[in-house]
A protein has these predicted regions:
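Central antiparallel beta-sheet cores of small beta-barrel/beta-sandwich binding domains
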Residues: 1-77, 85-104
């Protein structure tokens, strides 16, 4: 499994601009994702599919905030750094900037 651990990055959207924390964990052999956005209650994330391609993870997830809508995530890891983006229905592409591993 790629990218397990806690990560942080900067995002800029019409709803939030600042640092976001992402926890990627092993959920009984499946990928699990938790996102922490200051001041915003992020609903639970249901993982629909995950594909690994070399150093890149492509995932499709859903949340109760957008029922029945797929959120696509692509993250490419390079040791303790990453870049990537989310494609969120009705919002569009949200880029991860300055992605880096943070202390456990």
């Amino acid at each position: 499994m790629l990218g397990l651990g806690k990560w942080a990055c900067n995002v800029n959207t019409m709803f939030f601009s600042g640092e976001v924390k992402i926890n990627i964990f092993d959920n009984n052999g499946e990928y699990g994702f938790e996102i922490d956005i200051p001041g915003i209650q992020v609903p639970d994330i249901t993982v629909k599919s995950v594909e690994e391609d070399d150093d890149t993870v492509n995932a499709v997830v859903q949340t109760s905030l957008l029922p029945g809508k797929d959120i696509e995530m692509t993250v490419t890891f390079d040791e303790d750094e990453f870049d990537g983006f989310l494609k969120i229905p009705f919002i569009g592409k949200v880029k991860f900037k300055d992605g880096h591993r943070i202390a456990e």
